[in-house]
Regions:
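Positively charged n-region of N-terminal signal peptides that target proteins for export
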Residues: 1-4
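Lipid interaction determinants
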Residues: 9, 17-144
Length: 144
């Protein structure tokens, strides 16, 4: 009986420790988002600033649970809505400036793609990939 009790206690302790590791790795994944990321592709097409456009970026402040960035013309900000454990991510209602730029092509592509994002993955080579509900890459970003 005593051996069974000790074995049960060890099993409970081991289960508790493994859940701590999961929580830590989830937090680590979210922390990996922290900072600014340059948008390199949208829907498989390379994104390069055209004359009059700013560099398209998305930044994360994980501590403040905030997303900010520039979609090529306008600045934007939103709440960070992510679950690192599940790899889910959505952009909340975003506030944006309303400037008109000579070419709004990048702006349109970025904002349309942002509306499709439901998940994310950080690849082995350090790229951030936003994914749509079907699992396909919507945007690829590189850490600045």
């Amino acid at each position: 009986m005593k051996k069974m009790f000790v074995a049960l206690c060890m099993a409970v302790a081991l289960a508790g420790l493994s859940s701590c590791k999961t929580a830590q790795s989830a937090a680590s994944t979210l922390e990996a988002l922290d900072g600014e990321w340059k948008i390199t592709t949208v829907e498989g097409q390379a994104i390069t600033p055209k004359p009059g456009e700013a560099e398209a970026i998305i930044g994360f402040n994980v501590k403040e649970k905030r997303v900010y960035g520039n979609s090529g013309c306008n600045r934007l900000t939103s709440a960070l809505q992510a679950d690192a454990k599940k790899g889910t991510f959505t952009f909340g209602a975003a506030a944006s400036t309303r400037m008109m730029c000579p070419d709004m092509d990048t702006e349109q592509k970025v904002l349309t793609a942002m509306g499709k994002v439901t998940g994310y993955e950080i690849t082995k080579d350090g790229k951030l990939v936003f994914k749509a509900e079907d699992g396909k890459a919507v945007m690829t970003l590189e850490k600045k």
